[in-house]
Amino acid sequence: IPANNGLLLQQQEFLQFLRQQCTANGTLLIFDEVISGFRVGFEGAAGLYHISPDIITYGKIIGGGMPVGAYGASAAIMANISPEGPVYQAGTLSGNPVAMGAGIAQLTELLKPGFYEELESKTTAFVSAIQQYAESRNYQFKIFQVGSIFWFAFTGQEHIRRADEIDGDSMNVFKTFHRELLNRGVYLGPSGYEVSFVSSAHTEADMEKAKLAI
């Protein structure tokens, strides 16, 4: 799920095509789930779309707020990493206990029954209310959403799957939108290309305040 240049939701068939072509041509399929990992489900986008990548990368959420990154792959691929294999990978802060402890605590929370269902329901209710209001005013406005990730797009387009489909002029509208929300006590990322997230820490009061401000 490309989510660092807008939220570009891909079709299931396209992702399956990538998997098939990589397999047929002996190419590794890598899923970057630094943003989508653990946000759209405990198995990330790979689980959501039922696609098995050869290599997968994670970050952000797995550290519970602490800086951390991780990657995983099949046993055959991971056998290439030292000391078993020739590829050296290490770092001063690799596996540092503070980040690992925070990450374990975070993942324990995510595994609680109903966690993702409640989070997605909260996000969907928030997004739907804003979208319905925009449509009632005939605004050129669309909120793209998957799981707890959403993206405000000032466009009438129903689908945006590639970065070059984003109207760059709409970013001028976002600048005003961002400034007005700041004045009302709601902070979004400073770029119109950035996605936003709902977390379990957001209360109903938080969501209502943001909704009314928007």
Regions found by a protein language model. Give the residues of each.
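Conserved N-terminal phosphate-binding loop of PLP-dependent enzymes in the Aspartate aminotransferase
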Residues: 1-214
